[in-house]
Amino acid sequence: IQLIYQVNVQLGAELEKDLLGRESVICRPAPDTRYRFVTMAESVFPNEAQQRPIVVGFGPCGILSALLLAQMGLRPIVLERGSNVRQRTKDTWGFWRKSQLNTESNVQFGEGGAGTFSDGKLYSQVKDKRHLGRKVLDEFVKAGAPPEILFLSKPHIGTFKLVTMVERMRAEIISLGGEIHFDTKVVRLLQEPFVDSKSNHLDTLTSEGANENIQRQVTGVCLADGTILNSRHIVMAMGHSARDTFSMLLKQGVYIEPKPFSIGFRIEHPQSVIDSARFGKNAGHVMLGAADYKLVHHCANGRSVYSFCMCPGGTVVAATSEEGHVVTNGMSQYSRNERNANSAIVVGINPETDYPGHVLAGIDLQRKLEKLAYELGGSDYSAPAQLVGDFLADEPSTALASAQPSYKPGIKLGDLSEALPEFAIEAIREAILVFDRKIKGFAMPEALLTGVETRTSSPICIKRGPDFQNLSMKGLYPAGEGAGYAGGILSAGIDGIKVAEALAVSLLGSTDSDVV
C-alpha cells in the first residue's frame, strides 16, 4: 500500500522560480480556488420592477442555490415540501422502527434532501474548471463540516454531521434576508405567453403539451393550501423522487425528456472481508479506516453492471416515499464503524429499449418494481432478501448466515430472481462472479442481497438551454439531481451554484461575462 500526498506550500519568488524549473521536482503552481461572485445586488432587493427568486426544494442543490442567491443580496424564498431536518429525522427513524411512513417527510423529502441520509460522499467526476466544488466544500466547513474535507481525496461527512450543517446553512440564508418555508408543497406553476423582446413575437402552447420550440414565461407558483407567490425566476431543485411534481410540470408544458437510470439490489458483506481483500495484512490500520470499492463489468448480454453509493461500515436503509413500495439505499456515519459494508449493485437501463412509450415511463417502471418488492417482502415494508450463494444457484434462501442484515424495518428471505427483469438478474449474477476475482470474498455465499434499488438517479431530464432556463418555460431553472443534472451531494451543490449565478445575471446583469 502506498500513500500519496500533495503538499500546498507558499514560497518566495526566487525559490518558486527555481523549483518550477527543475525537471526532477514534481511541482506546479497551486490553482486559485477562491470564489468570485458573478454579480451583486447594489441596493435592497427587490425594487418595484423585480421579484424575489423562488427556490423549490432544499436538498444540496436547493441549499447551495438559495445560499448563493442570498449572498448576492437577492433574498430568495425557499419552498420545501418536507419538514425541517430535526422533524424529518424523527419521521424517518419512526418509519425504520415502526413502519409508519410519512409520505412528505422521509429519506427523500425534507430539509437536506436525500443526501442527508447517505454516506455523505463529497467527491464528484464532473468537470469543474472554476473550482465551484471548492466553494461548496468551503460553505460546508463554515457550517461545521470537518476541515479535512478540503484536502482528502475521498472526503465524506456522515448523516449526523450533515444535520447540524444543514441547520447552520439555513440560518445564514435567513440572516441574509431569505425565507425558508417547510411543509410547503408547490402544486402548480403560474405562467403567461412569452414575448420575445427582440422580435415582439408571442408564443402560445399547443394542445400537444410541452414543445422545446414553444416558450411560456413562468410568473409564480400555487401552493397546496391555495397560496399564490409571484416570481419570474424559479429554481426547480426538487430531487429525483418528486414524481408528482414531474407529472405536474409535464402537464403544464415544461419540456422534459426520459433519461437512463439503473436498477438492482444492495449487497452486504462483513466489513472485515472487504478490508482484508483490499488492504491485506494492513487491514484494520487506523490510517486506512474502512475499505471501499468501485466496480464495473460489461456483461455478455450487453448490459453494464456497477457498484453505486458504496457505504463502508454502514447500513442499508428503507428509502421509500410512497405507500406500498419498498426502496433501498445506503447510509454511513462519519465513523464508518458499523459491522457491514454495503453497496448497490445495479444494471443500467435506457428509455429506448427498457421503458419506451412516454416521458414518465421510467417512473412507471420504478413504481412497478418497488410495489413488487413490497409484496415480496410481506407487504409490511420489510425488504425481500437472499443470500448471494443462493442467488447464484437460483435457489430461495431460508436462513441467514454470517452476514447479518442491517435493513430496518426488517427483511424477508426468499427468491430475488422475481424482483427484477430477467436480463437484470442474469447480468448481476455474471457480474458478482467477476467482481469476486477483483475482491476476494465478494461472491461469498453468506453475503446478503436486499432489494430493490431503483432510485440511483432521476428517470427524467428537465431540459434547459445555455441560459440554464427550461427550453419551453422561460424563468424556470431546472437544477440538481431531480432535473437530471447532478448525481450526488457535491455535483448537486455545484449545479445549484451554476443555476443561481445564471438567475442572478438574468436579473441584475453580470460583472464577469466569462463565468456563466
Short names for language-model regions:
Residues I1-F117, K121-D196, N200-V516:
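Residues forming the flavin
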